[in-house]
Amino acid sequence: MREIVHIQAGQCGNQIGAKFWEVISDEHGIDPTGTYHGDSDLQLDRISVYYNEATGGKYVPRAILVDLEPGTMDSVRSGPFGQIFRPDNFVFGQSGAGNNWAKGHYTEGAELVDSVLDVVRKEAESCDCLQGFQLTHSLGGGTGSGMGTLLISKIREEYPDRIMNTFSVVPSPKVSDTVVEPYNATLSVHQLVENTDETYCIDNEALYDICFRTLKLTTPTYGDLNHLVSATMSGVTTCLRFPGQLNADLRKLAVNMVPFPRLHFFMPGFAPLTSRGSQQYRALTVPELTQQVFDAKNMMAACDPRHGRYLTVAAVFRGRMSMKEVDEQMLNVQNKNSSYFVEWIPNNVKTAVCDIPPRGLKMAVTFIGNSTAIQELFKRISEQFTAMFRRKAFLHWYTGEGMDEMEFTEAESNMNDLVSEYQQYQDATAEEEEDFNEEAEEEA
């Protein structure tokens, strides 16, 4: 079967990673000891994508937990599903990265990276046919961003033909841990542009706004934000974990979603939005779900899709519903908002339906959009980066670990290039292409 090896790095990565395993274990009927107690063959049909079947019929996540300090991993180990993970797959240092990208990427992280790669090899060897890797991490800290991107490039070297997929939490001043987040995030994006095939941008700004505005939580905690993240991660991996036709593996998803190699930053969305522990009173209809999931308020990246255009879209509907109605509603959205979809990629909206809904909901839909509006997120980070960098504020923490200012300048310009590329395709029309071809013919 086509397996995926999951890696979680740093505090944020381990917290959202642990939530992800709680949610999908529940969906597949697997309890905290790794024993199956499910009620449907669909749950086991593709279980081997994310789980290894060990002796005694126990299912063990193909997960590797990495951090430069023991704290977060101790709390994962003592958390609700802490005993399900393979004990050898906890790899941690003692020093911490102190929210410093350079420590994660060049010094402390570089010392630990070989022991992580040993575990990665061991997991990859037990796979029948490895399709790729997924990493959960944040871009604002030191370990997830610095060491996370180091791991990506090392794994890329060793497994160049496997898909690399990340769930990357983008920092925001509204939920900020550290003042140097813009530096860490820019240095990380510089790596992600080159070394990943698909990156889901999970934006703390958007998560905060959803909790505050939609769910009416006055002081959202990380627990509330992570509840949204785990619902989204469960949704975007549905096609990988349950039987179905569309985007059934990471490579097919990449082929459908990524028209140009650098533009692989996706905006996830989810509907209906519910707060932790709440029950849904009435099932939404398919038209309501479709309308909600295309709404800017339901996006997990703080970008307004109406400020850009969609290059490609994938939607995953979950629960028992009429396929015909789903197709009609999706066509309806495209016809009514045709200006928001680039016309030079016909049929750029794909829909999948899975019978098993998430826990506590009758129906739900997850949205994956490759929209040029994602440039707003990169612009936001870039502005914060430039404000500090032009005064060389806090730079000594990075140069002290052996980094050069040049690397900052390169990362800054790479991110600005990315923004211009998105803008270029936002402005491109099908007609321009024809003019372009005519010019080429004249020159020839």
Swiss-Prot record:
GO molecular function terms listed in the Swiss-Prot or TrEMBL record: GTP binding; GTPase activity; metal ion binding; structural constituent of cytoskeleton
Keyword line: Cytoplasm, Cytoskeleton, GTP-binding, Isopeptide bond, Magnesium, Metal-binding, Microtubule, Nucleotide-binding
Positions with a binding annotation for GTP: Q11, E69, S138, G142, T143, G144, N204, N226
Compartments in which it is found: Cytoplasm, Cytoskeleton
Modification after translation, per record: Some glutamate residues at the C-terminus are polyglycylated, resulting in polyglycine chains on the gamma-carboxyl group. Glycylation is mainly limited to tubulin incorporated into axonemes (cilia and flagella) whereas glutamylation is prevalent in neuronal cells, centrioles, axonemes, and the mitotic spindle. Both modifications can coexist on the same protein on adjacent residues, and lowering polyglycylation levels increases polyglutamylation, and reciprocally. The precise function of polyglycylation is still unclear.
Positions contributing to Mg(2+) binding: E69
GO cellular component terms, A-Z: cytoplasm; microtubule
Magnesium among keywords: yes
Name of the protein in question: Tubulin beta chain
Taxonomic placement: Eukaryota, Metazoa, Chordata, Craniata, Vertebrata
